[in-house]
Regions:
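Glycine- and acidic
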Residues: 1-3, 19-31, 53, 59-64, ...
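C-terminal, charged and often intrinsically disordered regions of DNA end-processing helicases
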Residues: 1-49
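A structural signal for short, well-ordered beta-strand segments and their strand-loop junctions
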Residues: 6, 129, 167-169
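Conserved catalytic cores of phosphodiester-cleaving nucleases, focusing on short active-site segments
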Residues: 10, 41, 151-176, 194
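Short loop/turn segments at secondary-structure transitions that flank enzyme active sites
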Residues: 13, 22, 47, 51, ...
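A non-catalytic, helix-rich entry segment at domain boundaries
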Residues: 44-133, 137-138
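Active-site metal-binding core of divalent-cation-utilizing nuclease and nuclease-like domains
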Residues: 128-161
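Conserved small/polar residues in nucleotide/adenosyl-binding loops
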Residues: 192-199
């Protein structure tokens, strides 16, 4: 989860954002950093799967194959995400991409195709949720008494096949983080194993 990563990276930034509720101001920039790249990819995937599940929750092999052949449709999902997340314009507007933005757009389309090809191997499956916010309160006994905190995050996607619920966490780049200690490997698992992730 992003909040946990923010805490591990910089506790003061975590406090300002998640405890005090302060947000960093939106910057108007032509640049696409890795966080924005990931956000655009996430929204593109969500738009694609929202369309795929418009008539039912089950994703069939034929649906994915048809979408994989439709480059115009895939580009339209990415364009919609760019309009919302980078350009901050209405869906009807047609912003002009600069060279770097155009390259990033094509890379995101290729990532989206790879996601669809990966999911093709898993079909048929049922879409359970996308971009689902989860949180759990945990009470820890300390020397000063019990201390309660809330851990939370957003699950990119949950889908199901037969009796298996799959949690999908999209990764679009960056170098793999090496945990400083063994505890960091298991903390996020607490959220994913809580008793009610599938409302």
């Amino acid at each position: 989860p992003s909040a946990l990563n923010a805490y591990l990276d910089c506790r003061l930034r975590f406090y300002y954002r998640y405890v005090a509720g302060l947000k960093t101001p939106d910057e108007v920039s032509a640049e696409i950093d890795s966080a924005l790249f990931g956000t655009i990819f996430h929204l593109s995937a969500q738009l694609a799967y929202t369309d795929l599940t418009a008539t039912g929750k089950t994703i069939q092999k034929e649906d994915l194959e048809r979408l994989l052949r439709n480059d115009v449709k895939l580009q339209s999902y990415v364009d919609q995400a760019f309009k919302k997340e980078l350009f901050k314009v209405s869906p009807e507007e047609k912003p002009e991409y600069n060279g770097i933005q155009l390259i990033n757009s094509k890379v995101i389309v290729s990532y989206l195709k790879q996601l669809l090809r990966n999911d093709l191997q898993y079909t048929p499956f049922e879409m359970v949720a996308m971009e689902k916010k989860v949180s759990e309160e945990i009470t820890i006994q300390t020397g000063q008494g019990p201390f309660t905190l809330r851990l939370g995050g957003t699950i990119d996607r949950m889908d199901a096949k037969e009796s298996t619920l799959r949690i999908v966490d999209y990764k679009t780049g960056g170098s793999p983080k090496i945990p400083a200690n063994i505890e960091q490997l298991f903390t996020p698992c607490l959220l994913y194993t809580s008793p009610s992730p599938r409302d």
